[in-house]
Amino acid sequence: MGIKVYKPTTNGRRNMTGSDFAEITTSTPEKSLLVSMSKTAGRNNTGRITVRHHGGGHKRKYRVIDFKRTTDNVVAKVATIEYDPNRTANIALIVYSNGVKSYILAPKGLEVGMTVVSGPEADIKVGNALPLANIPVGTLIHNIELKPGKGGQLVRSAGASAQVLGSEGKYTLVRLQSGEVRMILSTCRATIGVVGNEQQSLINLGKAGRTRHMGIRPTVRGSVMNPNDHPHGGGEGRQPVGRKSPMTPWGKPALGLKTRNKKAKSSKLIVRRIND
């Protein structure tokens, strides 16, 4: 992926950058793998906002991604590399030798015409999926399962990767992108390689309109609200927070407060936390 820099022909275009989409091979998705999406604008069934800053945006269709990769020992050929509006990573359309088509996350280095396969006997090659127990120490992986057969849940965004550090009993030690070291069942599957489109984080949207096209609404500062809307609100002119520390709109400390559930059963599987 390359970064395209726009000429400053207008104020909105100044400093704007975007992807050159050099890796994309087609603009037409596989129709059988598309699902309609309805917008909720962050509202629940009662019509109240439960997620702020959601709404608007370009109409999308969901691409059904195969995060499980359970079609074992059947070779699949990469047909296309496509753009997916629902995620930062690109996706690859693969066609199995039995004719079945599916989408997978496109790892770095995967190209049209290459083959991928899943299963315990699969080679350690980019795009192949196999159990953690069969992956050598030091290998970079992505799309990692937390429960066997549930499908990949970790390391799925553009440019992300994790590294296998070793095994301990029925668990495999994996260092995640954040630096956290976690024990994951060795029967869980992962895909070899780094997620592609790694320069996506360097894109400068340049103007508010591009953010609105993505379905993200403005974030309003609490200090410019009324006191009944936010703990920081009210006062004549610009005023300080007026509390010991900044607060969330619901009156809880906004900075430094640990949000992890102390009773989470998975805590015993975390060997090294992010800040240790």
UniProtKB/Swiss-Prot annotation:
Single annotated GO MF: structural constituent of ribosome
TM ranges: none
Segments of this protein annotated with the region Disordered: 219-268
Gene Ontology terms describing biological process: cytoplasmic translation
Keywords tagged on the record: Ribonucleoprotein, Ribosomal protein, RNA-binding, rRNA-binding
One cellular-component annotation, GO: large ribosomal subunit
PROSITE patterns xrefs: RIBOSOMAL_L2
Keyword set includes rRNA-binding: yes
InterPro entries given in the database record: NA-bd_OB-fold, Rib_uL2_dom2, Ribosomal_uL2, Ribosomal_uL2_bac/org-type, Ribosomal_uL2_C, Ribosomal_uL2_CS, Ribosomal_uL2_dom3, Ribosomal_uL2_RNA-bd_dom
PANTHER family: LARGE RIBOSOMAL SUBUNIT PROTEIN UL2M, RIBOSOMAL PROTEIN L2
Function comment: One of the primary rRNA binding proteins. Required for association of the 30S and 50S subunits to form the 70S ribosome, for tRNA binding and peptide bond formation. It has been suggested to have peptidyltransferase activity; this is somewhat controversial. Makes several contacts with the 16S rRNA in the 70S ribosome.
Subunit comment: Part of the 50S ribosomal subunit. Forms a bridge to the 30S subunit in the 70S ribosome.
Family: Belongs to the universal ribosomal protein uL2 family.
Protein name: Large ribosomal subunit protein uL2
Gene: rplB
